[in-house]
Curated annotation (Swiss-Prot):
Name assigned to this protein: GDSL esterase/lipase EXL4
Entry-listed glycosylation sites: N23
UniProt organism field: Arabidopsis thaliana
Gene expressing this chain: EXL4
Tissues of expression: Flower buds and pollen.
Lineage start: Eukaryota, Viridiplantae, Streptophyta, Embryophyta, Tracheophyta
Domain of life per record: Eukaryota
Length: 343
């Protein structure tokens, strides 16, 4: 009789623990970084970096602007769906998150944020330290709703999706003279960025995170804004901006291969998420993927004061952010890379 009770308790315990893994792998998605992932945290900040105004959100449910920088869902939402977790990743700073929201993951990212300490302060958005502090607050809430043991299991098995560097290179390095004043060449600056990114993930690791999906930056030289200001008469991609982006990505890629072997990251897994080449493939072969415009944004530009009628035909929705369809297109490969690298 005792052995039967033990068996039942073991099976029940196994079942309870397994509920922390969706499809046998990941119980939650926790997103950090910039506007590629931000699902509405900036709504509650005193900053001009806002995505909760028209024409953002026009493809979202009920055609409402939620704080996402795009026409609909952003990359963090789509990754959450691709991992089998949920279709919408809520912002941590929204007024209310249910226990279910907390157990399956939230977003800490902030549009305009960067890993360079200068970047977030320039735009008055959440700094890396702010996001880490929010993560600590999230863990306290998760422990209160799920219990300490289950909360620890959720955090250690969650995918930690990190997007940092786009604003640092695009704004702090190319858009302002701050990097030049600090005497930083592209090589030195991208080395510092990669180091700051590693330090940020170590702070998340120290709170229990173990599975990191580290996103490279997108082709910054091919953004509609870059093409207009630096692309010349034919508004081509800017080679130098792309070269710096690739330089940074190369250092991130190398880091994801070595950090997991360091004593300070014992038990952690890292996978590099190649945003640059997957999006560049869509830009170069846009017609093959069902787009009709790869150079201009659908809205919010000098060339598109009135929003286009169909954002699904545009690779970019505004002057820097991909459209939801572009995110869905590149996610097919990238989500599989995350699954393979962190399973």
């Amino acid at each position: 009789m005792c052995s039967k009770i033990t068996l039942v308790l073991t099976l029940f315990s196994s079942y309870f623990i397994s509920t922390d893994a969706v499809n046998g792998s990941f119980p939650a998605l926790l997103a950090f970084g910039d506007s590629i992932l931000d699902t509405g945290n900036n709504n509650f900040l005193l900053t001009f970096m806002k995505g909760n105004i028209w024409p953002y959100g026009r493809s979202f449910s009920m055609r409402r602007a939620t704080g996402r920088f795009g026409n609909g869902r952003v990359f963090s939402d789509i990754v959450a769906e691709g991992l089998g977790i949920k279709k919408i990743l809520p912002a941590y700073r929204k007024l209310f998150n249910s226990p279910s929201d907390l157990r399956t993951g939230v977003c800490f990212a902030s549009g305009g944020a960067g890993v360079d300490p200068v970047t977030s302060k320039l735009l008055r958005v959440l700094t890396p330290k702010d996001q880490v502090n929010d993560f600590k607050g999230y863990i306290r809430k998760l422990k209160a709703t799920a219990g300490p043991s289950r909360a620890s299991s959720i955090v250690s098995n969650a995918v930690i999706l990190v997007s940092q560097g786009n604003n640092d290179i695009g704004i702090s390095y190319f858009g302002t003279p701050t990097a030049a004043f600090r005497g930083l060449t592209p090589n030195r600056y991208t080395t510092k960025l990669a180091g700051w990114n590693k330090q940020f993930m170590k702070e998340l690791y120290d709170q229990g995170a173990r599975k990191f999906a580290v996103m490279g930056v997108i082709p910054l030289g091919c953004l509609p804004m870059t093409r207009i200001f630096l692309g010349g008469f034919v508004i081509t991609c800017n080679f130098f901006a792309n070269r710096v982006a690739e330089q940074y990505n190369g250092k991130l890629r190398s880091g994801t291969k070595s950090w997991g072997r360091e004593a300070g990251f014992r038990g952690a897994k890292f996978v590099y998420v190649d945003m640059y080449n997957t999006l560049m493939d869509v830009i170069k072969n846009y017609r093959r993927y069902g787009f009709s415009n790869e150079k201009n944004g659908c809205c919010c530009m000098i060339t598109a004061i009135i929003p286009c009628p169909n954002p699904d035909k545009y690779v970019f929705y505004d002057f820097v952010h991909p459209s939801e369809k572009a995110y869905r297109t590149i996610s097919k490969k990238l989500v599989q890379d995350i699954k393979n690298g962190l399973a």
